[in-house]
Amino acid sequence: MELFDLTIHELHDRLKRKELSSVEATRAMLARIEAVDPKVNAYITVTPEEALAAAEAADRRIAAGDMAPLTGIPVALKDIFVTKGIRTTCASKILDNFVPPYDGTAVAKLKEAGAVIVGKLNQDEFAMGSSGESSAFGPTRNPWNLECIPGGSSSGSAAAIAARTATATLGTDTGGSIRQPASHCGCVGLRPTYGRVSRYGVIAYASSLDQVGPVTRDVTDCALMLQAVAGHDPMDSTSVEVPVPDYAKGLTGDVKGLKLGLPKEYYIEGLDPDVKKALDEAIETYRGLGAEFVDISLPHTDYAVATYYLIATAEASSNLARYEGVRFGHRTEGAANLIDMFRKTRSEGFGDEVKRRIMIGTYALSSGYYDAYYLKAQKVRTLIMQDFLKAFEAVDAILTPVAPTPAFKIGEKTSDPLRMYLSDIFTIPVNLAGTCAVSVPAGMSGAGLPIGLQLIGRPFGEETILRAAHAFEQATAWHTQKAGI
């Protein structure tokens, strides 16, 4: 097995036994990136000098007996996290030359744990997209089929795991942006509860929906990554001061008596036959493990996509107002006056999908439409939250598809934004409810593309869904399959 094939816990064991050094593991990963990434385009920026310096520091820590689970592990970050001294673009021309003066909290925590950051990953521009196609640096490709999308917006975060060009990655999830690409790329992807992980130093898309989470090769790695970044942060007023359990210790493999809900609104006509088959087989696997199933209803699911695209775009139109060419980022040349500079800078700097969402959000917030659209969407959001809270009175977790279909071809849905938006129909409600969910590999399509299942947990119930995901993983072999790239 190559060094770049190892999971976090496998690599940790070898580093601990001094069978190899972090420098060796990092060099192997950098060589893998150089060999494979030109085909996949998962990276925007690779940082070999910084990575090797961090690996040398990690080796010194290990030699001194100061070793955490992530010490010396090569990881990569979605290019939405600000990184001190390293270009941070959010996959947008408007931030092409932006080099932040500080690290975001999640980045700082990874560094404190001794992780080695090898680069910044491609994504949909400003995290707005479901396919990885809206990046100013070109689309990310799915390592399982280079003609297909990897999912979005954390496209590079999942593609790098599938291509084995990072041992683990961090992404963000606003409407499914970790879980959907994890499903399409055959990885484990976790969206923690809103407030579980600090958003300080994450470039904002929709502040009430964004959340930081890991993408990994297996559930144990996912638990280790969450352990490293979770916790209260005084720099983020939305982070919540609740205890952080030992997630890896909770992976017992025991789900006997666990009650799993099956929402009728998610098992609908039009679900791809391969996705339905994978979910049916997963249900039987859980039955064999002793889990119990309860039919439930989440009655306001039908309104989730419309609600999301009003709230998220409204928040985006406000958050993205700061990019005007004065303080940082791209500034147009030869503007006649200040207003002309604002207009031209934003016209040149933002891509089509970002402009579309800014316009939708500005319209929803405009005088005469605020009550009819934005305020009504917030009321529906409350109903969706209440649906989940009621369901969790009867069940411990909810089992659903992640996406209605496996990965589709690049360019297939770009001309039809509504079809693209519906790709996230099963993931968006979780963000609106502010709770947690994990995607875990559960099958393959007839065309050889991965399919994931989604486990949704109570607020701050990450321990339960990780335990359930781990039990499924132990009973199946889907997570061991590798893209032939």
Swiss-Prot record:
Catalytic residues identified in the record: K78, S153, S177
Enzyme class: ligase
Source organism superkingdom: Bacteria
GO molecular function, one term: glutaminyl-tRNA synthase (glutamine-hydrolyzing) activity
GO CC, alphabetical: glutamyl-tRNA(Gln) amidotransferase complex
Annotated SUPFAM superfamilies: Amidase signature (AS) enzymes
GO annotation (BP), single: translation
Reaction(s) this enzyme catalyzes, per UniProt: L-glutamyl-tRNA(Gln) + L-glutamine + ATP + H2O = L-glutaminyl-tRNA(Gln) + L-glutamate + ADP + phosphate + H(+)
InterPro entries assigned: Amidase, Amidase_CS, Amidase_dom, AS_sf, GatA
Record EC number: 6.3.5.7
Record's keyword terms, sorted: ATP-binding, Ligase, Nucleotide-binding, Protein biosynthesis
Annotated NCBIfam families: gatA
Family membership noted in the UniProt record: Belongs to the amidase family. GatA subfamily.
Task of the protein: Allows the formation of correctly charged Gln-tRNA(Gln) through the transamidation of misacylated Glu-tRNA(Gln) in organisms which lack glutaminyl-tRNA synthetase. The reaction takes place in the presence of glutamine and ATP through an activated gamma-phospho-Glu-tRNA(Gln).
Assembly and binders: Heterotrimer of A, B and C subunits.
Protein's recorded name: Glutamyl-tRNA(Gln) amidotransferase subunit A
Organism (species): Geobacter metallireducens (strain ATCC 53774 / DSM 7210 / GS-15)
Gene: gatA
